[in-house]
Swiss-Prot record:
It comes from Bos taurus. GO terms for molecular function: lysozyme activity. Lysozyme C is capable of both hydrolysis and transglycosylation; it also shows a slight esterase activity. It acts rapidly on both peptide-substituted and unsubstituted peptidoglycan, and slowly on chitin oligosaccharides. The ruminant gastric lysozymes, which digest symbiotic bacteria coming with cud from the rumen, are much more resistant to inactivation by pepsin than are other lysozymes. It comes from the Eukaryota. One of its GO terms (biological process) is killing of cells of another organism. It catalyses: Hydrolysis of (1->4)-beta-linkages between N-acetylmuramic acid and N-acetyl-D-glucosamine residues in a peptidoglycan and between N-acetyl-D-glucosamine residues in chitodextrins. The gene is LYZ2. Stomach-specific. Lysozymes have primarily a bacteriolytic function; those in tissues and body fluids are associated with the monocyte-macrophage system and enhance the activity of immunoagents. Belongs to the glycosyl hydrolase 22 family. Keywords: Antimicrobial, Bacteriolytic enzyme, Digestion, Disulfide bond, Glycosidase, Hydrolase, Signal. Residues 1-18 form the signal peptide. Disulfide bonds join 24-145, 48-133, 83-99, 95-113. This is Lysozyme C-2. Monomer. The lineage of its organism: Eukaryota, Metazoa, Chordata, Craniata, Vertebrata.
Length: 147
C-alpha cells in the first residue's frame, strides 16, 4: 500500500511539472511545426525566446498582478490577450484557446497561438525576446542540433 501511495505522488509530480524539453529536441519540434523562418523569425530566435520565457517548460506559469493576468506554457502566452483561463478580467482570447491547452506536452496548440501572435504583433510581443535575444548572436541555441 505504501508503495502505491509513493507511486501516486511520483505520477502526480510528473503531471504537474509537465514536459521540460531538451534544447535540440525543442528545436526539432518547432521546426517540424513550421516555426523555422515563420514571419522571418529564425529557429534560433524561437529557441532563445522559449529559453528565457519558460526554460523550455510546457507547464510554466507566471502571474502578473498589475494586469491580473497569467502567462502560460512554453511561450508564456498571456491570458489577458491570447487565451482563456476563465479568471482574467476583460480577457480578449485572441487565439481562441484555453490557457490550459497551452501547457500540454504536445505543443502544437501553443505553436499555433505563437504563430498568430507573431503574425499580429511580431516577435517583439515577447518582452524576454527583446531583453535577451534581440541584437544578440542566438546561433548557439541551435548549435550542435541535428535538424
Amino acid at each position: 500500500m505504501k508503495a502505491l501511495v509513493i507511486l501516486g505522488f511520483l505520477f502526480l509530480s510528473v503531471a504537474v511539472q509537465g514536459k521540460v524539453f531538451e534544447r535540440c529536441e525543442l528545436a526539432r519540434t518547432l521546426k517540424k511545426l513550421g516555426l523555422d523562418g515563420y514571419k522571418g523569425v529564425s529557429l534560433a530566435n524561437w529557441l532563445c525566446l522559449t529559453k528565457w520565457e519558460s526554460s523550455y517548460n510546457t507547464k510554466a506559469t507566471n502571474y502578473n498582478p498589475s494586469s491580473e493576468s497569467t502567462d502560460y506554457g512554453i511561450f508564456q502566452i498571456n491570458s489577458k490577450w491570447w487565451c482563456n483561463d476563465g479568471k482574467t478580467p476583460n480577457a480578449v482570447d485572441g487565439c481562441h484557446v484555453s490557457c490550459s491547452e497551452l501547457m500540454e506536452n504536445d505543443i502544437a496548440k501553443a505553436v499555433a497561438c505563437a504563430k498568430h501572435i507573431v503574425s499580429e504583433q511580431g516577435i517583439t510581443a515577447w518582452v524576454a525576446w527583446k531583453s535577451h535575444c534581440r541584437d544578440h548572436d542566438v546561433s548557439s541555441y541551435v548549435e550542435g542540433c541535428t535538424l
